[in-house]
Amino acid sequence: MEENKQRVKSIINILQLVAPGTPLREGIDNVLRAQTGGLIVLGYNEQIKSIVDGGFHINCAFSPASLYELAKMDGALILNETGSKILIANAQLVPDSSIDSIETGMRHRTAERVAKQTGSLVVAISQRRNVITLYQGNLRYTLKDIGVILTKANQAIQTLEKYKAVWNDGITNLGILEFEEVVTMSEVVHVLHSVEMVLRIKNEILSYIHELGTEGRLIRLQLTELLADLEAEAALLIKDYHQEKTQDHHQILKKLQDLANTQLLEDSDLVKLLGYPGQTSLEESVTPRGYRITSKISRVPPLIIENLINRFKTLQGVCRATINELDDVEGIGEVRAKKIREGLKRIQEHLYMSRHN
């Protein structure tokens, strides 16, 4: 799992350099359209120096036009690590020929070997196939056509909307059951499954956004709007139902996201994530602490909510508390006590109305 996270991080870092809208990508696209092919190395360290033969040092500021003109020559272009300077043009690269390569073309085989030998980012632009391939270490990534990525991103957004609707239904139903005091582990796990799927699709959309660069702004806005408050509410859900009250619920949500990236989770995985044994029955009754519901009451800060839960222990305890009992809690006066009672009543009414709509 750690290896997969590192790979994803590496891809994101690479894509930020060559995403649409960046000067480097503009230059690469110009070379692609001209069908001249090209080989670009980012970084000029001792390892790169040892495999560069010939070429001429120009050490000029990078521009898409310069890249396009210099790529017309047969040799490789050596840029600095950030791609802001062109250091060498028409360089002959001589990597170790004993390094394994899955590529068949000379340009791509050289690119793969240079990347494996030096760890530098190497961009190979195909002359005939109109393909841009990125290499870094053992990583190989082929850039897709922007139109294809946009189509996939829009499809993923539509899928996310469906799972967001599943989340909304599940969290509404859970809220009603919480007020009725009949929650079982099954309902909590069902909602966590919808969180898992939302996070899984979110990660896929983020990968498209990184590859789209400036073309992905609208997709990013849609993603932000769809996920507004969902992750914060999911963290409070975990805080409500985790066996240990002191556990860092944000850290557990992050763990859920990491797991969602690598595997489809079983019910027992989610039960264990909440601090219970994996064999715990899904029919077992569970009681919410009340963080999620009380956080919906307007103008009640987190510190006051913490004081409420510390005093009454559960959501049911808060709901049953009288105005005087609420008034006794530190930071809550008579006015705020009434607001809490009214707020809980409004939330309950809203949940029942949502279920019948």
From Swiss-Prot:
Q: Which residues does ATP bind?
A: 75, 93, 106-110
Q: Which InterPro entries match?
A: DisA, DisA_sf, DNA_integrity_DisA_N_sf, DNA_integrity_scan_DisA_link, DNA_integrity_scan_DisA_N, DNA_integrity_scanning_protein, RuvA_2-like
Per UniProt, the enzyme's principal EC class comes to: transferase
**What reaction does this catalyse?**
2 ATP = 3',3'-c-di-AMP + 2 diphosphate
Q: What does this protein do?
A: Participates in a DNA-damage check-point that is active prior to asymmetric division when DNA is damaged. DisA forms globular foci that rapidly scan along the chromosomes during sporulation, searching for lesions. When a lesion is present, DisA pauses at the lesion site. This triggers a cellular response that culminates in a temporary block in sporulation initiation. Also has diadenylate cyclase activity, catalyzing the condensation of 2 ATP molecules into cyclic di-AMP (c-di-AMP). c-di-AMP acts as a signaling molecule that couples DNA integrity with progression of sporulation. The rise in c-di-AMP level generated by DisA while scanning the chromosome, operates as a positive signal that advances sporulation; upon encountering a lesion, the DisA focus arrests at the damaged site and halts c-di-AMP synthesis.
Nucleotidyltransferase in keyword set: yes
Q: Which cofactor is recorded for it?
A: Mg(2+)
Specify the DAC domain's residue ranges.
8-146
Protein family according to the UniProt entry: Belongs to the DisA family.
An example GO biological process term is: DNA repair
- The protein depicted here goes by the name DNA integrity scanning protein DisA
